[in-house]
Design a protein with these regions (language model features):
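Short loop/turn segments at strand-loop or loop-helix junctions that form parts
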Residues: 9-13, 55-57, 182
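Flexible, D/E/H-enriched segments
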Residues: 1-49, 61-159, 170, 191-282
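Short, conserved secondary-structure transition motifs
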Residues: 184-190
C-alpha cells in the first residue's frame, strides 16, 4: 500500500520570513531556510506526494482535528507576531482523502479525531512557513494536524502518530512525509528585551536541556528521550506542549524506535527558544 518515506522535526520560526526582507535582519535565518529546502529536495527525491504537518500553531481545546481541504489559498498575517509575518501569500493543494483516512484510523485506535474537508479553516504558520521553503513549486499536497493541544495527553498524541503511520501504510495509495513543526524548548524572551534575544536562549537551563536532548537523539537513546518527554515539555515550555513531537515519535515507534537522526540544520536559538531541523530514518 502506501509508504511513510520521511519524518522530521522542524523549526518554523517567523524570523525565517523576516530573513527574506530588506532590513537589519536580512539573512538572519539563511541556515534554517536552507535546511527546509534540503528537506524539500529529499521529499522530491523520495517521490512524496503529500506532506502531513503536525502544527503547533493550530490550537484546539477538544479532540484532535485534521485540516484536509482540497485547496488552501490566501494572504496570511500572524496574529501573534504581525510585525514578523505579514501579507504572506500562499496557495497549496490539499488531500481530503488522506485526511479522512488519518482521522478514521486514529478514531478507530481510540483517539477521537475529526477531518475537515469542506471547511473555511485556513492554515497556521507552523504549516505555512515550512511550505514556503519546502514546497515553492506546490508539488506536494498539504494536510495539517492540530498539535497545540491544550487539554490532551501526550500518550494520546503518540497513539495518533501510530495511527497516522498505519493509515498511510495500510490504507493509502501514495508516499507521505510527516513533519513535527515546533521548537524544542519554547520560552519566548520577555517583552521589552526580545530584540536582545534574536540569536540567544532565554535561559541557560533551557539550552542545556535542549542540547542534551539532541545528544540523546544522536546516540539513539530513544527510550530515555520518550520517557522524559512529558517532563521536558512541562519544564521547558514545550511548544504546543510537544504534542507534535509525541505524534512524530508515535509514528516512529516511540521507545522501540531503532532508527537514527540526521541533523540538517544544527541547533540554534531564536527569540529565546531552541530550534532545529532534524530528519529521522523510517
Amino acid at each position: 500500500m502506501g509508504k511513510l518515506a520521511l519524518a522530521a522535526k522542524i523549526t518554523h520560526v517567523p524570523s525565517m520570513y523576516l530573513s527574506e526582507l530588506d532590513g537589519p535582519h536580512k539573512g538572519c535565518r539563511d541556515s534554517a531556510i536552507a535546511g527546509h529546502r534540503e528537506i524539500g529536495r529529499r521529499c522530491r527525491d523520495l517521490g512524496i506526494d503529500t506532506i502531513v504537518v503536525f502544527d503547533t500553531h493550530w490550537l484546539v481545546n477538544s479532540g484532535y482535528h485534521v485540516n484536509c481541504a482540497a485547496r488552501f489559498e490566501g494572504v496570511y498575517t500572524s496574529n501573534e507576531l504581525p510585525h514578523f509575518i505579514k501579507n504572506l501569500p500562499y496557495a497549496y493543494d490539499g488531500n481530503p482523502a488522506l485526511g479522512q483516512l488519518l482521522a478514521s484510523t486514529a478514531t478507530a485506535a481510540g483517539v477521537n479525531t475529526r477531518a475537515h474537508s469542506e471547511t473555511s479553516l485556513t492554515l497556521e504558520y507552523g504549516t505555512l512557513v515550512p511550505m514556503r521553503y519546502m514546497n515553492e513549486d506546490r508539488r506536494f499536497k498539504v494536510v495539517s494536524v492540530s498539535s497545540l493541544c491544550t487539554v490532551h495527553d501526550l500518550k494520546d498524541s503518540a497513539t495518533l502518530g501510530r495511527a497516522v503511520r498505519r493509515a498511510i501504510e495500510e490504507e493509502y495509495d501514495g508516499t507521505v512525509a510527516i513533519l513535527a513543526s515546533g521548537s524544542l524548548s519554547h520560552r519566548f524572551a520577555q517583552n521589552g528585551v526580545s530584540e536582545q534575544y534574536l540569536h540567544k536562549m532565554w535561559d541557560p537551563f533551557l539550552e542545556q536541556v535542549d542540547l542534551r536532548v539532541v545528544e540523546l537523539w544522536q546516540r539513539g537513546e530513544w527510550a530515555t528521550f520518550t520517557a522524559m518527554l512529558p517532563m521536558y515539555a512541562e519544564k521547558c515550555w514545550g511548544e504546543g506542549y510537544m504534542h507534535d513531537t509525541a505524534m512524530l515519535f508515535g509514528a516512529l515507534g516511540w521507545d522501540r524506535y531503532e532508527g537514527s537522526v540526521d541533523i540538517v540544520t544544527p541547533y540554534f536559538a531564536s527569540s529565546g527558544t531552541g530550534q532545529i531541523n532534524a530528519v529521522f530514518s523510517v
